[in-house]
Amino acid sequence: VPEVVDWYGKDPYNTQTFTTGLCYAICDGVAWFKTAVKDFTYPVLMLHGEKDGLVSVQDTYDFFAAASSTDRQMKIYGGLYHEIFNEYCRDEVISNTLRWMRRRL
């Protein structure tokens, strides 16, 4: 979506690099996540872009399979990348998300 690309490029907090601190935080988070997933019983909606180059789709499948939640739903969006809420079919993604949330309110 062109306006998102424009906004992203102008965001003063956007960076094209990963800091060492961010890398450590991600590694720590992944380690915690792997131990905590078995106790995850909250409602969960897993959304993922099929062509995501940052996070493996397999990670979403693995979390979904390991989570203890009985109220869970997964949607892999074909052709989308990492930022599914900023892609060409973002209206569909947002609509699906809101529908899921409203059913639980």
Q: Where would I find each of the regions flagged by the language model?
A:
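Short beta-strand/loop motif that positions the catalytic acidic residue
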Residues: 40, 46-48, 52
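Alpha/beta-hydrolase
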Residues: 1-42
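Acidic catalytic loop of the alpha/beta-hydrolase fold
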Residues: 15-17, 23, 51-55, 83
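Short helix-capping segments at alpha-helix termini
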Residues: 67-70
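Catalytic active-site module of serine/aspartate enzymes centered on a nucleophile-bearing elbow/loop
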Residues: 73-105
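Conserved strand-to-helix beginnings and helix N-cap segments that scaffold or border functional pockets
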Residues: 20, 56-60, 86-91
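Short alpha-helix in the alpha/beta-hydrolase fold that links the catalytic acid
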Residues: 42, 56-65
